Amino acid sequence: MQGLRGSTRAGFRVINGAALQPLPPINDPRPEIAEIADNAAAMIGAADDREFDVFVSHASEDKEQVVRPLARALQEHGLSVWYDEFELRIGDSLRRKIDSGIARSRFGVVVLSKAFFAKGWTQYELDGLVTMSVGGKQVLLPIWHDISKDEVVRQSPSLADKVALRTSDYSIAEIADEIAAVIKGAAVAD
């Protein structure tokens, strides 16, 4: 065979008297791999098909003082809460888990603060929650923490229009009671 620079020879030889046996059939691993993948997807899907009463969006700076106690208080009310400390594990895709949590929650609690409006991830979550709210698939419940109405208006005029609870006016327990009443009242109406 002639190539661009030179030639190549190929050949084979048959050894007389050698016992020629057919090769054993090659097993195609694809069906087994597909079955394993389907089973894994079913197991993951089963775990991820949970519905949540509420998704809690917040800035990490507000976690200690407001968000962690609020998430726990909501659980004590018997609500299913999507909160990062409850749901995220090492190796998880942050974006996928957040998107999934938002999509599978009936209500979105947003703890608005100066730190909240300064972060990219919280804005990403807020965009998702507002999209779900506008589409009628979720109810947005704002909590204002150490932030004024003017500051909320500057950041998001549409959020300033929503009735909100302020951490300066209500205790965490009172806020949790109010959120639980709204969620449980909506469940009765459904």
Residue ranges and their predicted role:
Residues 118:
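Glycine/Thr-rich phosphate-binding loops of Rossmann-like dinucleotide-binding domains
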Residues 148-160:
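Glycine-rich, charge-decorated loop segments at or immediately adjacent to ligand/cofactor-binding or catalytic sites
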Residues 2-111, 121, 130-139, 145-148, ...:
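Conserved N-terminal substructure of TIR/SEFIR domains
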Residues 114:
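Short, conserved catalytic or interaction motifs in soluble domains
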Residues 52-54, 160-163:
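Short amphipathic alpha-helical segments
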Residues 162-170:
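Short secondary-structure boundary motifs at beta->alpha junctions and helix caps
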